[in-house]
Regions:
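Alpha-helical segment proximal to the catalytic Tyr-Lys
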Residues: 32, 77-78
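Short, small/polar-rich loop/turn modules that mediate ligand/substrate recognition or access, typified
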Residues: 80, 85, 145-149
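A glycine/serine/threonine-rich, flexible loop-to-helix segment
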Residues: 81, 94-121, 163
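C-terminal substrate-recognition "lid" of short-chain dehydrogenase/reductases
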Residues: 126-153, 158
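Catalytic Tyr-X3-Lys loop
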Residues: 5-24, 44, 68, 119, ...
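Conserved mid-core segment of classical short-chain dehydrogenase/reductases
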Residues: 1-13, 57-60, 113
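Active-site helix of classical SDR
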Residues: 27, 64, 72
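Residue(s) in the substrate-gating loop at a strand-loop-helix junction
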Residues: 48
Length: 163
C-alpha cells in the first residue's frame, strides 16, 4: 500500500507477479493442455473491484488487476475459436488475509462503520462470502455461451461496477 509515485519498483513488480503474471502463467499452461485435448474448456480469472474503482494508495494492487481484465479478454479473443472460454469474477469486500485487523479498522472507521458493518456496506446490506464468489466462478465455468465477460460479486457497489 502506497501512493503510486512513492511505490518502489520492487513492490510494484511483486504485485504484478501475484496479481497479473500468476494468472498469465497458469492460463498459458492451461491453454497448452486444452489445445492438446482438443475439447475446449474455460479459463477463470480473479479480478477485483479495484480495476474499476481503485482506492487511494492502492495503485500497486489496482493497476495489475485492471491489466488482468484485459488479459482475460485477450484470452477470450484469441482462443474462443478453439472452444476455450474466458471470464472473470469481480469481487469486493471478501474476508481474506489481504487486510490485517488494523487496516480493516482504518478502512471501516474512514467510512464511519464498524469492521463487521464494513463487509455489509453494499446495496443488498449483505456480507459477500468466499462461497458467493465460488458460486459465481462455477456459474461462469458452466455457461457454454459466455466468454470475455466479468461477473460482479459485491452485493451492489455501483461505483465499482464495470461501465
Amino acid at each position: 500500500q502506497s501512493a503510486i509515485a512513492d511505490c518502489s519498483t520492487q513492490d510494484l513488480e511483486r504485485s504484478f507477479r501475484i496479481n497479473l503474471y500468476a494468472h498469465q502463467w497458469l492460463a498459458s499452461a492451461a491453454v497448452s493442455v486444452l489445445r492438446a485435448q482438443g475439447m475446449g474448456g474455460f479459463l477463470l480469472f480473479n479480478a477485483s473491484k479495484a480495476a474499476w474503482n481503485p482506492g487511494a494508495e492502492f495503485g500497486p494492487y489496482a493497476i495489475p488487476k485492471a491489466a488482468l481484465v484485459a488479459l482475460m479478454k485477450q484470452y477470450a479473443l484469441e482462443y474462443g475459436a478453439l472452444g476455450i472460454g474466458s471470464a472473470a469474477a469481480n469481487a469486493d469486500r471478501i474476508r481474506t488475509q489481504l487486510l490485517d485487523a488494523a487496516e480493516l479498522q482504518a478502512r471501516a472507521r474512514a467510512r464511519g462503520l464498524s469492521s463487521d458493518a464494513y463487509y455489509r456496506a453494499n446495496l443488498l446490506a449483505r456480507e459477500v462470502t468466499a462461497d458467493d464468489v465460488a458460486e459465481a466462478f462455477l456459474h461462469l465455468a458452466l455457461a457454454p455461451s459466455t466468454t470475455g465477460s466479468v461477473v460482479t460479486v459485491d452485493g451492489g457497489n455501483i461505483a465499482a461496477s464495470p461501465r
